[in-house]
């Protein structure tokens, strides 16, 4: 855990310009300091913040696998605030979410765009949420390639294959038809919290945390 915490801390320090709060806990062995993300990891909370890229994806996947090993029957909570990013990096997170035994509850805070929206929709059924002022956006995958005509054709076919795969999975998770998804992702399609719930991207909009009775 300490090694994972160190890696996570360094990543988030870079992303936040060096400002990561530390939490001091008292125990029988004395005081112990955690960065805030490592402390939340103990509560089975993972933060996915910023562009989706390979390094982030490896960290998220590692944390999902670690929490599964800790308790395979307890939910994991993935908080998303991301503009999107790499399709392959995002798919590695998605596949890990589907692979592990615990349900992964997804919660959008701020924004979940492109691959961020896809991962939001990929959470466990009935456990996909967002806060009331969050924004979601879906669109088709973007790609650009320069080179010989034959290579451009190869990459164009790959992008079309990826688009069909993403649209099919999004249709599965939202309950929309494939034709509807294909139409709605032709251009950037922004959604409010309420619209995302109607569309099936999430299951509910959360205004207040429900406290146990």
From Swiss-Prot:
A Gene Ontology molecular-function term?
Answer: ATPase binding
Q: Which residues form the active site?
A: 114, 139
Q: Where in the cell is it found?
A: Cytoplasm
Entries under Gene3D superfamilies matching the protein: 2-enoyl-CoA Hydratase, Chain A, domain 1
Primary subcellular site in the record, as a coarse category: cytoplasm
Q: Which reaction does it catalyse?
A: Hydrolysis of proteins to small peptides in the presence of ATP and magnesium. alpha-casein is the usual test substrate. In the absence of ATP, only oligopeptides shorter than five residues are hydrolyzed (such as succinyl-Leu-Tyr-|-NHMec, and Leu-Tyr-Leu-|-Tyr-Trp, in which cleavage of the -Tyr-|-Leu- and -Tyr-|-Trp bonds also occurs)
- GO CC entries: cytoplasm; endopeptidase Clp complex
Q: Which domain of life is it from?
A: Bacteria
BP GO terms, sorted: protein quality control for misfolded or incompletely synthesized proteins
The protein's matches in CDD domains, at most eight in alphabetical order, are given as: S14_ClpP_2 (cd07017)
Q: Which UniProt keywords apply?
A: Cytoplasm, Hydrolase, Protease, Serine protease
In short, the EC number is: 3.4.21.92
Q: How does it assemble?
A: Fourteen ClpP subunits assemble into 2 heptameric rings which stack back to back to give a disk-like structure with a central cavity, resembling the structure of eukaryotic proteasomes.
Question: What does this chain do?
Answer: Cleaves peptides in various proteins in a process that requires ATP hydrolysis. Has a chymotrypsin-like activity. Plays a major role in the degradation of misfolded proteins.
The family assignment reads: Belongs to the peptidase S14 family.
> HAMAP family, from UniProt?
ClpP
| Name of this protein | ATP-dependent Clp protease proteolytic subunit
Q: Which organism is it from?
A: Pseudomonas syringae pv. tomato (strain ATCC BAA-871 / DC3000)
Classification from the root reads:
Bacteria, Pseudomonadati, Pseudomonadota, Gammaproteobacteria, Pseudomonadales
